[in-house]
């Protein structure tokens, strides 16, 4: 299942916000959507309301329109009119075949199974503020659930061969499609020096889950809080994952408790959980994140990933697509922090200035300054600021700031407002 569009309905926080998850080039929904923005703009609220819709769409009153697809068939729920008695008319449609499936008075049993969103086994993972390392009992329970998943694979293997005596499989072939193979592959790809190798028995004949670090077997009690976090949040996904691996996943702040290097890899970790045997992602993953490292990785995959920035504009929440490609020839943390979080930095300013020099063959600062001044978007009243360095005079604010950064001892200061003004001009030049 994949979400395509949402139109909210006078929500307390989100108002009448509209979200579109479609790739305009293909007309298909993005496989991955990442929400970003300051605290309080509704990232987690969007995920929570989506979960409510997936559970009981007829009992949700936050939306005017939701469009989704299941196995390439597009369905929609739409609230059309308010009746005199205060009730709402609901239109449930098969958009692909232009058929009205149900109108008004919806109850769960009324839905055609193939179009019912709460038959799709979506998975929702909230962020955790508590440290699993401080609650060993909780993590012990997670490990027991991991053992159960391993046993489930074994039972399914035996059941398959009993049910299909004429086409029995070797364990190695069956394991390729199993949940624990999925986990092992994603886990081992994530960690450089740590591996999961399966379930075994200790000297007391008790079942144990096997991990190695730097080639040495380690007990689960010695795992770090970040390592435990990866396992803890992965287990519910494995438990609810269906055979087709096409569960819709809603994940709030997957980077919690993780080092920045791991934050950069967690995006791929969740994608890896839902790859088929040919390496193709089968589901849609919708995340909310504050991590520059995760977002840098997300922005590097514009073919299947959409980044949406939610922002408060005079009390109204608006959605802004972070479009691709970026202004630079490659993605940098400085650009991510500006485009996604609205944080201007001298580093990003100079990256843009250097990009202009390289792209337009203006290697000398003076030549670049003249090029900027001659650009149609340049306005001397806004973008002009005369400065000198040695015997050379520069006329643009961008060159002034560039020289102030590179020659910090020249006594030239600049404000954040000037920094943003110069950044916006250079973005227009590079657009």
Question: Could you describe each region identified by the protein language model?
Answer:
Residues 2, 7-11, 22-24, 131, ...:
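Extended helical coiled-coil dimerization/tether regions that scaffold
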Residues 4, 9, 20-22, 69-71, ...:
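A structural detector for beta-sheet-dominated domains
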Residues 61, 197-198, 347, 412:
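Short, flexible/disordered secondary-structure transition segments
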Residues 58-66:
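Short beta-strand-centered segment that lines the nucleotide-binding/catalytic pocket of NTP-utilizing
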Residues 72-74, 78, 82-191, 337-344, ...:
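Coupling/switch segment of ABC-type P-loop NTPase heads
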Residues 1-57, 204-331:
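Switch/communication elements of ASCE P-loop NTPase nucleotide-binding domains
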Residues 2-5, 13-15, 20-25, 271-280, ...:
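RecA-like P-loop NTPase motor core
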């Amino acid at each position: 299942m994949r979400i395509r569009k949402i139109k909210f309905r006078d929500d307390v926080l989100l108002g009448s916000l509209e979200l579109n998850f479609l790739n305009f080039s293909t007309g298909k929904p993005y496989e991955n959507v990442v929400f970003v923005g300051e605290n309080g703009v509704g990232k987690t609220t969007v995920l929570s309301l989506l979960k409510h819709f997936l559970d009981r769409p007829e009992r949700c009153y936050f939306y005017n329109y939701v469009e989704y697809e299941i196995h390439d068939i597009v369905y929609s729920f739409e609230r059309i009119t308010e009746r005199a008695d205060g009730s709402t008319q609901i239109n449930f449609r098969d958009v692909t075949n232009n058929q009205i499936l149900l109108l008004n008075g919806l109850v769960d049993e009324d839905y055609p199974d193939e179009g019912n969103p709460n038959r799709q086994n979506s998975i929702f993972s909230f962020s955790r503020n508590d440290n699993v390392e401080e609650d060993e009992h909780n993590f012990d329970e997670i490990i027991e659930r991991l053992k159960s998943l391993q046993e489930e694979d074994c039972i399914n293997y035996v059941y398959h061969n009993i049910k299909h005596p004429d086409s029995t499989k070797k364990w190695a072939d069956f394991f390729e499609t199993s949940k624990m193979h999925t986990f092992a592959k994603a886990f081992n790809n994530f960690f450089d020096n740590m591996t999961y190798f399966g379930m075994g028995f200790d000297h007391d004949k008790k079942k144990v889950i096997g991990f190695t670090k730097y080639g040495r077997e380690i007990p689960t009690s010695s795992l770090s809080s970040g390592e435990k976090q990866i396992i803890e949040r992965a287990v519910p996904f494995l438990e609810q994952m269906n055979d087709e691996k096409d569960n819709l996943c809603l994940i709030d702040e997957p980077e919690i408790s993780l080092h920045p290097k791991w934050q950069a890899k967690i995006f791929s970790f969740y994608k890896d959980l839902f790859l088929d045997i040919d390496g193709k992602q089968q589901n849609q993953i919708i995340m909310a994140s504050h991590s520059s490292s995760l977002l840098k990785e997300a922005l590097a995959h514009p073919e299947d990933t959409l980044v949406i920035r939610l922002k408060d504009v005079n009390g109204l929440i608006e959605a802004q697509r972070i479009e691709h490609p970026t202004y630079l020839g490659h993605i940098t943390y400085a650009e991510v922090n500006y485009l996604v979080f609205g944080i201007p930095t001298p580093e990003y300013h100079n990256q843009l200035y250097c990009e202009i020099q390289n792209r337009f063959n203006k290697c000398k600062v003076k030549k670049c300054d003249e090029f900027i001044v001659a650009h149609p978007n340049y306005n001397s009243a806004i973008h002009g600021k005369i400065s000198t360095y040695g015997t050379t005079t520069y006329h643009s604010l961008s060159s002034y700031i560039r020289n102030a950064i590179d020659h910090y001892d020249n006594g030239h200061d600049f404000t954040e407002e000037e920094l943003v003004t110069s950044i916006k001009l250079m973005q227009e030049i590079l657009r």
